[in-house]
């Protein structure tokens, strides 16, 4: 554990120094290719940093924050786009907005109108899920089918909400939420575009979808340009998830996750085309059941297979236990001495 924490300090120390360089040097360079060339060495470094970890909790977090989000932010920053514009007022804020999964809130937060019991309920489910993993063998298959997606959503939502709350206090500004109750999605377009992982969606839109659509509009009809933008975005998302799985498992990619996102890209594009031709006549509740059901089934077939085979959730639980034991020993030794 001590070696892993030393690696953590070195990796994130390197990240902070690199982002500080981006704040002082590339920001003074004219936007475009020259600024892009000045940030590319940092992007390459961020792709390497997760490989210094053994623990999945550190490698996956670093991959998500640096290899994916920070790299996209810096590439968009090179062209005066993305969440780093306008340039934060000081270095500390620039480091936070670059390295952490946060985005300055630009619109009123609709989640403020949610009942007060929603967050405590999620925390209670989070605690329950931490304990129910020990009884996985005893659970019926139909329950296990929904356990992985529920676990993924609740863990991410609770932890990222806590991070947002702390950084809202530290930075003294309102931050965008990461999720907008995705279980209420009435379509795949609603789920991926407006409810699930909004931080990533806000980066994919200017970073992948809009450029591809803009280029394709000169070659084909606007409908096909939208389709190409949609498919490219989902394909890139699939490759990025394959990269994260590689950082965690250090195994050859299976492309299962890529096919999951390609499938959802096709289905989302078809859904958008159908909605343009006709109006939905189904009730919102039925649409939610169909949408969530499709996500759960396809996720079980293509998305969560690698997680289950690699025992990632169990490994993370063991890593958390090791970390807690390490802290207890250090505190005990400190109090005794």
UniProtKB/Swiss-Prot annotation:
Membrane topology: Multi-pass membrane protein
Cellular localization per UniProt: Membrane
GO biological process: lipid metabolic process
EC assignment: 2.3.1.75
Species in which this protein is naturally found: Arabidopsis thaliana (Mouse-ear cress)
Protein name: Putative long-chain-alcohol O-fatty-acyltransferase 10
Task performed by this protein: Catalyzes the final step in the synthesis of long-chain linear esters (waxes).
Pfam families documented for this protein: MBOAT_2
């Amino acid at each position: 554990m001590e070696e892993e924490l030393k690696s953590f300090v070195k990796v994130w120390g390197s990240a902070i120094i690199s982002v500080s360089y981006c704040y002082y040097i590339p920001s003074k360079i004219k936007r475009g290719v020259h600024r892009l060339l000045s940030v590319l060495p940092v992007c390459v470094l961020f792709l390497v940093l997760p490989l210094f970890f053994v623990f999945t909790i550190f490698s996956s977090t670093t991959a998500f924050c640096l290899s994916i989000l920070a790299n996209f932010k810096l590439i968009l920053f090179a062209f005066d786009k993305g969440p780093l514009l306008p340039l934060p007022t000081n270095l500390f804020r620039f480091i936070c907005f670059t390295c952490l999964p946060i985005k300055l809130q630009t619109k009123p937060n609709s989640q403020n109108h949610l009942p007060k019991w929603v967050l405590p309920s999620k925390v209670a489910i989070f605690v329950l899920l931490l304990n129910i993993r020990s009884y996985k063998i005893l659970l019926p298959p139909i329950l296990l089918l929904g356990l992985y997606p529920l676990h993924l959503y609740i863990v991410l939502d609770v932890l990222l909400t806590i991070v947002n709350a702390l950084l809202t206090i530290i930075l003294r500004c309102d931050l965008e939420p990461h999720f907008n109750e995705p279980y209420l999605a009435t379509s795949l377009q609603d789920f991926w575009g407006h409810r699930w992982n909004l931080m990533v969606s806000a980066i994919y839109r200017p970073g992948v979808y809009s450029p591809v659509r803009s280029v394709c509009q000169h070659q084909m009809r606007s409908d096909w340009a939208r389709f190409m933008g949609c498919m490219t975005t989902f394909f890139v998302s699939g490759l990025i998830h394959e990269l994260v799985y590689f950082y965690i498992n250090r195994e050859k990619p299976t492309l299962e996750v890529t096919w999951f996102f390609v499938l959802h890209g096709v289905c989302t594009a078809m859904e958008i085309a159908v909605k343009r031709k006709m109006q939905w006549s189904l009730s919102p509740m039925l649409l939610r059941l169909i949408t969530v059901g499709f996500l759960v089934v396809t996720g079980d077939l293509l998305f969560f297979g690698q997680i289950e085979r690699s025992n990632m959730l169990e490994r993370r639980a063991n890593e958390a236990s090791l970390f807690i034991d390490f802290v207890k020993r250090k505190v005990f030794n400190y109090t005794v001495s």
